[in-house]
Regions:
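Short hydrophobic alpha-helical runs that function as membrane-insertion/retention elements
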Residues: 114, 272-275, 293
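A cross-family glycoside hydrolase active-site/sugar-binding cleft signature
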Residues: 88-89, 115
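Active-site proximal beta-strand in glycosyltransferases
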Residues: 104-119
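C-terminal amphipathic helix plus adjacent low-complexity
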Residues: 303-369
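Nucleotide-sugar donor-binding catalytic core of glycosyltransferases
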Residues: 2-83, 89-101, 122-285, 333-334, ...
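Short, acidic/turn-prone active-site loops that include or flank metal/cofactor-
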Residues: 118, 164-167, 297-299
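Active-site/pore-lining binding-face segments in mid-to-C-terminal subdomains
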Residues: 257, 287, 296-297, 320, ...
Length: 369
């Protein structure tokens, strides 16, 4: 563990929160950034850019077609001194274009780290010019475990897998668990076959099935969105989970990756039902019994699965508590940040250890039957 001089940041976080707006897929990224600021000596740099401008559009279209990467309108980093770590999270390969505008990030940091969220193997070729920008970083981390090898081969740089995480404290239903008044909660992509079956089941049994009824990618406020999501899942008995882009094989091909929903469901103590990803990383991260109760995508038998689970209250309680404990002890953002620091050759600060102590105390409460 390291100590840090008061007022002197050792980490500079480049955040796109003023560029991407409050897109829902960005909310977990901002959650991670905010926790880093709480547990480390970090400074947040969040420049603005007009993504609808001609300049931004032209730079993006050009990078799709040529190896020329122009600044899309990002103001460069001013003289801020020197940091131990420069850290950024990119949602998609196109976001890497921002670092044509802040090319001096290597000059002001000992180690530069980029965490890339969504990158499918099938999309590597068309995004190759964007991905070349990753060659500027010292450390490249990926949320998609199966993309690590092909991306490493493209940029001739070792990439590593970093699993998604969760604010396990905010999502934790303990020490004061509330009544789970929502029977089934489904958010995001869904099977229409399973959805129609759940609608029928809810009508016939007068159960509460909560699901999306509008389309759109923007939240009003990212923090409020995450807080509301945590509140809803904590009040849900069953939470539907499936691998990323499960309904879009044209983009993902045969690739199977772990989405945020698995971490959210476990942390909030909901019983997760859906597809168990055929992914080696998943078997390491969610290896405990009943982590996910399998319901095949497009299944019309989900009502029978729920009926079987409802017949065994002791099993239900065990599933809930185990998921919460696992999230608190393994999947909180503090553990992900420790992995980032390790890649940069740094130790966590005291605030990180204090958060881990709090997580362990909550885990002790959750484990008590």
């Amino acid at each position: 563990m390291e100590t840090q001089s008061p007022g002197k940041a050792r980490v500079l976080i480049f955040s796109s929160r003023n560029i991407d707006g409050n897109a829902h897929y960005r909310c977990p990224h901002f959650e991670f950034e905010d926790i880093i600021c709480k547990i480390d000596s970090a400074e947040l740099f969040a420049p603005k850019a007009d993504v609808s401008s001609l300049r931004f559009s032209f730079a993006t279209r050009l990078a799709y077609r040529t190896p020329i990467t122009l600044n899309p309108g990002i103001h460069g980093l001013s003289d801020r001194g020197r940091y131990d770590v420069f850290f950024t999270i990119c949602a998609f390969p196109q976001n890497l274009l921002m670092f044509s505008g802040v090319s001096n990030f290597r000059d002001i940091s000992k180690t530069s780290v980029c965490l890339l969220d969504e990158l499918w193997i099938a999309d590597i070729a068309k995004h190759r010019h964007f991905l070349r920008i990753l060659e500027k970083f010292d450390v490249v981390l990926l949320y998609y475990s199966q993309t690590v090898k092909p991306l490493s081969e493209l940029i001739k740089r070792r990439c590593s897998f970093l699993p998604p995480g969760i604010d396990a404290i905010s999502f934790c239903p303990y020490p004061d668990p509330v009544q789970r008044v929502i029977d089934v909660y489904s958010i995001g992509r869904r099977s229409q076959i399973t959805h129609q079956k759940l609608l029928e089941w809810a009508r016939e049994t007068r159960r509460f099935y909560l699901y999306d009824t509008i389309r759109g990618s923007q939240t009003i406020d990212s923090k409020e969105h995450r807080a509301a999501l945590a509140n809803i899942i904590r009040r849900s008995r069953y939470f539907i989970v499936n691998p990323g882009k499960i309904d879009d094989p044209s983009q993902r091909g045969q690739q199977i990756e772990i989405g945020n929903r698995y971490f959210e469901g476990a942390a909030a103590g909901a019983i997760m039902i859906g597809e168990r990803p055929a992914n080696e990383a998943f078997e390491t991260l969610f290896e405990w019994p009943d982590a996910v109760t399998r319901v095949p995508y497009n299944s019309s038998d989900i009502d029978m699965v729920i009926k079987d689970l409802d017949a065994d209250p002791e099993r239900q309680e065990r599933i809930r508590r185990t998921g919460v404990v696992q999230a608190l002890t393994r999947h909180d953002w503090v553990y992900r940040w420790e992995a980032v620091l390790k890649s940069a050759g740094l130790a966590p600060l005291q605030a990180a250890e204090e958060r881990k102590v709090r997580l362990r105390k909550l885990a002790e409460i959750a484990s008590q039957g």
